[in-house]
Every structure is written in C-alpha cells, then in structure tokens.
C-alpha cells in the first residue's frame, strides 16, 4: 500500500474526468440496486436531514485547517423524483472525496514518524471502488475512515477540546461513538534505544463509547465505601500489620484507612486518594500497605514514592525506623547527589525508590527535547529510567502538587507505568474543582480520566446559572469523591468519640491599624493599582499588562507588612514593553531558525533567574528572553525613560547588545509569527489561582535577600518599624514573658519581611533560626535540629511556601501568620505542622489582618474557597463556587463591593 504522502498528484482535468466517470458508475450501480425510484415519506425525511448535514459540512469546511477539493454548489434540496438522481450524484461525489482526501486534524503533540503501512491506503486512479466501500446515506459510518480520529502521525489529545473532530469532517456527534478506534502508536522497536514515545495514545485516552461509559460507571460505584468501623477487628488487623514488619501499632482510624486502601487495590480502581487531614498518619498507613501488599512478581516489585525535596529524608527515615530489620525494605533515593544514574533494570531491584516531582519534570523535559530533535543525529538518548521502569505501585505524596494538569511533573506522573496508583493529600481540592481532574487522570479512574467527560458531567455544569443543573453536577461530584476518596478530619467522630485526641486549637484574628503616615502612602499605592486595573479591563485584557496587575497586588500586600518592602519598587517604575512600528519590524527580521526555536519552547523559563515567566521579554535578533524583573535589572533603568535608543546591556546568553527597540513580548511575537507552544503557558497563567502566579513573583524576592540584608545592615541607625512589625514584637514578647518556654513559629510569604523580623528579634536579644527557600537542604536541617533541641532557640522564621508541608514541628505550640494567603489550604497546612499527632500542649494561632486594606478582601476570598472545599467534600449544600474571575479581581482592588 502506498502512503498518503506517496500518492501521486493528478491534473485538474484528469481529476474531473475521473470524478465524472466514477459518478456515472455509482449512479448506475445505485439505480440498479434500488427496488423503486420513488422514495417513501420516511426516506424523504431522512434525505432532507442528510442533505442539511452535508450542507453544514460544506459550510464548516471553508474554515477548516485542511480544505477539501472544490465542488460546485449542491443542487436543490427539494427531494423530488426529478432532482433526486442529481442530488445523489452530487452526494456520492462528495462522499468519494472524503474517502480519498481524509481530514487530518492538526495536533500540538510531536509524534515519532511511523511506517507508511500505518496510514490509510489510497486507491489508485485506475481502480474504481465498489459501492460497498463508499459510505451510503445512512446513519452508519464506514470502518474505512480511520483518519477521522487521527493516526500515529497525527494523534488526538482527548484532553484538549481543540483536537476533537471538527464538523468539517461531516461526522456528527451522534456518530462519534461508532467511529473506529485510533491507529496504535508506533512499536517501540522503531524508536531509538532508551527513548520514550511522545505519542499521545494512552490506555485511558480512547474514544468514548456509551456502552463502555455505562459499564465503567457501574464499576466506579462498586466498593465505594470502607468497611464499617465497628466491624473491623482492630487487634487482629494490628497483628497482621505487625507480623508483616511494622514496628508501631496503628491507631483505630489508621487501621480503618489501611483496610480501605487494601480493598481499593482489590477493586477495579487499583488505587485512590487518601485525603486524611494533615497529621492523621497518611504516611504510616501507606507504609503498612507496602508491607502487607507486596508484589509476587519479581519483574514488577518496586514501589515508586514521589515527594517534595523537603520530605525525601523524612520518608527515608520513616521507612527505616518504622520497619523491623528482618522485614527491612531496600530504599534508593533517586535525586540530587545521591542519584547514581541507574537504569530501569537496576531500579527494579529495589523495594522502594524515592524521587521528587522536580526529578520527574527534568526527565520529562529531557525526553521531550530529545524526541523533538532529528532522531538521525548522533546525540545519545537521555537517561529516563523513571519513565522506562514498570512499577508495582506509585504513591504521590502531597499529590495536589500535580493539580495543574499542564505542568511537566503532572504529565510525567500520568505517563508512568504502574499496576497500582495512590494520591496522598490532605487538600485534594484547593482552588477549583478542575484540580481534582488531574488526580483522576493520574489514577486512571474511568470514565472521568477523560477530560471531555469530566467537563461535560461535572466541570461545566458547576458553572451554570441554573440551580437544577448545578445540583445534578454536585451529586455526580460527590458520588465520584465517595468512590475514590477516603477522608477524615481531626473533628471526625466515631461512636460519638473523636478519632484522635489532640489538644485544643485556638485561632485569634488580630486587627492591625496602619499608622497615619502608612495610611496615606497605602492610599497612594491603591489609587495607582486601581488605575492599572481600569487600563487592563479597558484594553481587552491585554496579556502584556496582566503581569503588572499581579505586581500591583503584590506591592499592596507587601506594604501592609512594611513600607520598606516597596520603597524601591513603586508601581510607576514597572518595566514596560512598547508596541511600536520599529518593534514589529524587528520581529519580522527574525531568522527562520530562531523563530522555529522559539515556537517549539515548552516553557518560558527566565535565562537569568531560571523561574517561569508571566510575560517574557524577547531580545531581537538572538531570540533569547528573560522575565521582566531580570530585564529591568539588566538595562538598569525604567524602560522608555531614556532619550536615546541605545541601552548599554548584554544578552545573558550570547552576550549580544540589547537595544531598546529590540525588546518585544510574546504577544507581539505571536501577532507576527503565529501561535507559540509556550503561549499555552501564558493562557494557563490567566486561569491559575493568584497564589500560583504570585509564587513565581516571590521567587525573585528570595534572590535579593542577601543584598537587602547587607544594605539594611548599613542603615541600622535608620531603623524604622511598622505597625504590623510592632504587633509581632508585642505578641512574641507576651508569649516569652509567660516563662513557659513555649516555642513560636512565625510564617510570612515575603523573605525580605522575615529579614526585618529577624533584625527586630536581634534588637530584643531573642535567639531564633530561619527556614526558607533560599537555604540549602543541609542549612534547613541544621535549623530544624537547633529549633527542636536547643532550649534557648524560641522562634523559627518560616517561609510559608517552604515550610507549610511535610514538617513535624510539634515542639512549638504558637503560630503567627503575618499576612493572609489567597489559598487558605496553604495556611491550614502551615498550622498543621504544629497541631498534629504528637502535640501535647494547647495550640494558639495568631492571624494578623491589617484593617481597611487588601488583606481584609483576601480573607473574604479565603472564605469562598473554604466553602468550595466544604461543599465538595463535606457539605450537602448546592451553591458551588468557581475560581477567581473578573468580579473577584475588581473586588480585591476595591472597585466592586
């Protein structure tokens, strides 16, 4: 068979002659096979419906990315006997065209070239297909059209609505369930050794068939409840677990959780979401599962546990100290300096492999980069042992890390091969319901591991304005959660008794009033921010302005902590990119190879700070880019303030000169050269929660900590406190003054502010340590050791992002939250570092909220998000809440009450 690419083109005249000859043959064959030329009333009605369908197909095909051969306009739709034969003739010609020129939808995925035999065959010009090979005017669809669902060269990603079959292929939605399955991916033998196919075909990404969906829904609803608590023999279960090698006894609620995990692995789901509240023992329940449910297959025996970097050694210690030496598990840490570049066979010799999300993302990026290059090059394939290994069980700790399904880590987790899959997260839903889909996709929970079904049944209906649609979607969501998620909170009671006895937790909200001079400056900042918001919404949501809007939010929040945090970063000095004729001409002069390199980028990572960019700035003509903050540092002045076009600066990558008119942003680049792969990330940034977007901005703050502290040390004589810093000082002194030797955690999102708190503590002769993202793993470990073992160290200053997960800090019983965070789950996780199993003292939490500022509005946003999680996981109310939208954004800036 010849492939489509080998099919010889014909002249227009020859093509028309063949069409006419084929039409005459089809007409004769059609007439000879018809018992009567007069159509019945029912067939006439079907005829009209089909005619309308084809007319719509013709209309839609004009905008298709793959245009069909030109045809004259169809005859009249009036199904009379005089015009019927002409109409049939035109339709048969049309069907033959679809047969010989199949529609191939575009794809954003890069597939490995396959053999020509995998493509549908094209008949030669001399052969005339029989009437049986042409789709008739019935509701059925021929199995000879495999291309409408894509091929190995053009796979369709079912998670991307853009890749679904468009109407120009004339296949209707009702017929979609009867289409043939996609062609299989190319065999691994056709790939270079050591590579992973990037084909989007996966077992869970298949065409949706109603009968399969019904069957899968029935399977989903089976085994959806754990065994009743009072029917479990706790003593017998504990004996079984301890005989398997566990050194500690499980608490009653942990025995129940372990039993549920065992039952889920025995069901068709092969895993689930263990969503116990922070501090209830998800780790020990998982270790018990590893011991009691070991693999019997020596070729697939290894468990992969994916954690954050901060938890690597904690998991290793738990696996070492909680398991009897005679049953000890062999553990290998696949990360950093301990990584030995083992291949998949060597990894499969261990019982447990510990790795990190960043390591998975790195392997995914390396593999994609290799597959996107020419396979004929001599570049050796990268080592992707995690992707190549067949795992027995995969456990994602803090699984909400992959809640964004478009990140490299999430994509890599989905591609991993395993028999059983588990998600451990106390907050499986944080900002919106769509985050839960990423966990379902990893778990391959059918049928909702396909985005089109999840969106149709749950995601989109929850955003409806009709109460009945919302109620139905909420019921479906709760059934789905009940079938896949097992969750207990610290307030859960069994037989009218709490499942765990913890000391009481008291949360105190402390209102902070700005000083008069601070209030005047804050009002100035708010006015500038409001003008930016007005410009943003009045300019059709210009992406180039969106980054400035986020920065303005950041500055307002920083000001509430201390004016010095924004003293050198006023909104008026924001770095701006101008759209001018010179800029566009510079874009047009880009080298084609440079354009191709930019277009294939998967992520916008700044070449200076290596952080993801909200609005990257490209340098012409080299095509390298940085984030706006780094470019502002490079040029050393506010953009556009210079009277000359020359800026004395060098590209950080190639050391070429940077000229003012040679700086462009991604939106201008796209307007001239078309869509970029990486612009998908910019669109994603628009839909992400504010917490995720601002965390990118905050990473830059960590990089200037040392410079800020050095500068601050020289200005010690100019030291000036703030209203919030005064409140923190008074609260800490009151706790220490009680002389109970109680320790304190001080959380803040801003590392610069922690520098100010540190200086204040030094002035008060209070010993303290720090724990933030700027410190190495060894430095963090030293801080933890000092805080836990040195009685004189009473305070630990903790970055909210770095210290909100994985730590056990029950040595402290006071928590001070210096400012509110958009995502309340992050705050809850930070508090649970203290209020968890092992805590012996009452816990007090102080939440500082600056009065009549943006912080009060953030608290209001927090309430909505808490309500969302409550409705999804606990409540029976029917009022879902969506993600932050335009109205909430206006509300944050005080432009909407």
UniProtKB/Swiss-Prot annotation:
It comes from the Eukaryota. Coiled coil: none annotated. Transmembrane segments: none annotated. ATP binds at residues 276-283. One of its GO terms (cellular component) is cytosol. Residues 727-890 form the Helicase C-terminal domain. It is found in: Cytoplasm; Nucleus. A motif (DEAH box) lies at residues 397-400. Residues 263-446 form the Helicase ATP-binding domain. The keyword S-adenosyl-L-methionine does not apply. GO terms for biological process: double-strand break repair via homologous recombination. It holds the Pfam family SNF2-rel_dom. Keywords: ATP-binding, Cytoplasm, Helicase, Hydrolase, Metal-binding, Nucleotide-binding, Nucleus, Zinc, Zinc-finger. Its main location: cytoplasm. One of its GO terms (molecular function) is helicase activity. Its EC number is 3.6.4.-. Belongs to the SNF2/RAD54 helicase family. This is Uncharacterized ATP-dependent helicase C17A2.12.
């Amino acid at each position: 068979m010849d492939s489509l690419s080998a099919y010889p083109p014909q002249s227009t005249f020859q093509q028309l002659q063949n069409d006419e000859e084929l039409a005459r043959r089809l007409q004769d064959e059609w007439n000879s096979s018809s018992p009567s030329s007069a159509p019945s009333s029912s067939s006439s009605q079907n005829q009209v419906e089909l005619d309308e369908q084809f007319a719509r197909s013709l209309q839609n095909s004009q905008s298709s990315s793959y245009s069909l051969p030109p045809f004259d306009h169809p005859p009249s739709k009036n199904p009379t006997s005089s015009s019927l034969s002409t109409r049939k003739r035109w339709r048969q010609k049309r069907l033959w065209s679809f047969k010989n020129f199949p529609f191939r939808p575009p794809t954003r995925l890069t597939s490995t070239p396959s053999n020509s035999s995998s493509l549908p065959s094209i008949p030669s010009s001399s052969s005339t297909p029989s009437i049986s090979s042409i789709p008739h005017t019935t509701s059925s669809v021929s199995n000879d059209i495999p291309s409408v669902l894509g091929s190995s060269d053009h796979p369709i990603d079912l998670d991307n609505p853009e890749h679904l079959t468009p109407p120009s292929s004339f296949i209707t939605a009702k017929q979609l369930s009867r289409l043939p399955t996609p062609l299989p991916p190319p065999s691994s033998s056709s790939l270079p050794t050591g590579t992973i196919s990037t084909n989007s075909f996966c077992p869970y990404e298949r065409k949706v068939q109603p009968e399969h969906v019904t069957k899968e829904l029935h399977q989903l609803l089976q085994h959806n409840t754990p065994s009743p608590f009072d029917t479990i023999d706790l003593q017998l279960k504990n004996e079984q677990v301890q005989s398997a090698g566990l050194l500690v006894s499980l608490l009653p609620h942990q025995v129940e959780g372990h039993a549920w995990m065992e039952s889920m692995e025995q069901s068709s789901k092969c895993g689930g979401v263990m969503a116990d509240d922070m501090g209830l023992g998800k780790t020990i329940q998982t270790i018990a599962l590893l011991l009691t449910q070991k693999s019997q297959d020596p070729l697939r025996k290894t468990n992969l546990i994916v954690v954050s970097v901060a938890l690597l050694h904690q998991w290793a210690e738990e696996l070492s100290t909680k398991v009897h030496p005679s049953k000890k598990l062999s553990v290998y840490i696949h990360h950093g300096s301990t990584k030995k570049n083992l291949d998949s066979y060597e990894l499969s010799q261990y019982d447990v492999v510990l790795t990190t999300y960043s390591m998975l993302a790195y392997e995914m990026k390396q593999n994609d980069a290799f597959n996107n290059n020419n396979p004929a090059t001599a570049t050796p394939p990268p080592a992707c042992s995690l992707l190549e290994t067949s795992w027995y069980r995969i456990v994602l700790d803090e699984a909400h890390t992959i809640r964004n399904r478009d990140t490299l880590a999430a994509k890599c987790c989905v591609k991993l091969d395993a028999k059983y899959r588990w998600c451990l997260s106390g907050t499986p839903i944080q900002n919106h319901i769509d985050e839960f889909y990423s966990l379902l996709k990893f778990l391959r929970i059918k049928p909702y591991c396909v985005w089109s079904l999840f969106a149709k049944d749950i995601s989109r209906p929850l955003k409806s304005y009709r109460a009945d649609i919302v109620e139905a979607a909420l019921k479906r969501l709760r059934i789905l959660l009940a079938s896949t998620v097992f969750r207990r909170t610290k307030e859960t009671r069994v037989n009218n008794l709490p499942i765990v006895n913890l000391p009481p937790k008291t949360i105190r909200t402390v209102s902070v009033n700005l000083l008069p001079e601070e209030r005047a400056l804050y009002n100035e900042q708010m006015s500038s921010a409001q003008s930016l918001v007005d410009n943003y919404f009045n300019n059709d949501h210009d992406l180039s302005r969106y980054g400035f809007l986020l920065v303005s939010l950041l500055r307002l929040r920083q000001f509430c902590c201390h004016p010095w945090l924004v003293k050198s970063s006023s909104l008026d000095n924001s770095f701006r990119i101008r759209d001018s004729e010179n800029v566009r001409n510079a874009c047009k002069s880009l080298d084609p190879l440079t354009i191709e390199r930019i277009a294939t980028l998967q992520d916008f990572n700044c070449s200076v700070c290596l952080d993801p960019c909200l609005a990257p700035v490209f340098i012409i003509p080299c095509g390298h880019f940085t984030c706006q903050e780094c470019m502002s540092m490079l040029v050393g002045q506010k953009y556009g303030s210079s009277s000359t076009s020359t800026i004395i600066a060098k590209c950080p990558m190639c050391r070429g000169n940077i000229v003012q008119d040679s700086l462009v942003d991604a939106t201008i680049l796209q307007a001239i050269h078309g869509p970029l792969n990486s612009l998908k990330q910019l669109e994603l940034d628009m839909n992400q929660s504010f917490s995720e977007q601002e965390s990118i901005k905050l990473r830059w703050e960590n990089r200037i900590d040392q410079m800020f502290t050095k500068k601050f040390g020289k200005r010690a004589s100019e030291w000036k406190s703030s209203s919030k810093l005064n409140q923190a000082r008074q609260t800490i002194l009151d706790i220490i003054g009680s002389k109970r030797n109680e320790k304190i955690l001080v959380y803040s999102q801003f590392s610069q502010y922690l520098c100010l708190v540190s200086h204040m503590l030094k002035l008060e002769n209070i010993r303290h340590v720090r724990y933030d993202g700027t410190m190495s793993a060894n430095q963090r470990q030293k801080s933890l050791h000092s805080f836990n073992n040195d009685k004189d160290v009473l305070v630990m200053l903790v970055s909210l992002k770095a210290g909100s997960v994985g730590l056990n800090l029950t040595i402290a019983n006071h928590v001070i939250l210096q400012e509110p965070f958009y995502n309340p789950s992050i705050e809850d996780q930070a508090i649970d570092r203290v209020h968890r199993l092992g805590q012996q003292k009452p816990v007090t939490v102080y939440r500082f909220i600056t009065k009549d500022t943006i912080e009060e509005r953030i608290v209001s946003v927090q309430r909505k998000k808490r309500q969302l999680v409550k409705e999804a996981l606990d409540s029976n109310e029917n009022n879902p809440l969506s993600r932050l939208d335009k109205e909430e954004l206006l509300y944050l800036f005080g432009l909407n009450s």
